[in-house]
Design a protein with these regions (language model features):
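Long terminal segments
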Residues: 1-20, 24-26, 34, 41-42, ...
Length: 104
């Protein structure tokens, strides 16, 4: 069962209902409005514009091209439609958290 839900715009933690982040066109913002990253085509860039990952539709790869996670594994942690926005939410807001089953 997924720990988070993503409706295409907002990432919400299921257990508490807390809004963690949102997508505003191609900009990823945390709940307090701070910019965390940007979606640019198939690439994910951090708040400084550095490429940190890419998503080819099936898997997220780091900036060196090494596979980090597949979309199926992301969907086990975040409930939502598969796509670039879901992958970006996982990469920036869920990947490093210790409170979910998808910890890598």
């Amino acid at each position: 069962m997924a720990d988070y839900t993503f409706d295409g715009r907002r990432l919400v933690k299921k257990s508490s209902g807390q809004k963690l982040a949102e997508v505003d066109r191609d900009t990823l913002r945390s709940y307090n409005g701070a910019v965390f990253g940007q979606i640019e085509g198939k690439n994910l860039r951090d708040s400084h514009g550095k490429k940190v990952a890419e998503f080819n539709g099936k898997e997220v790869k780091d900036d060196r091209g090494k596979k980090v996670i597949g979309i199926k594994e992301i969907q086990e942690v975040i409930e939502g439609e598969p796509g670039m926005s879901l992958a970006a939410m996982w990469f920036f807001f869920v990947k490093g958290r210790h409170d979910h089953a998808g910890m890598l």
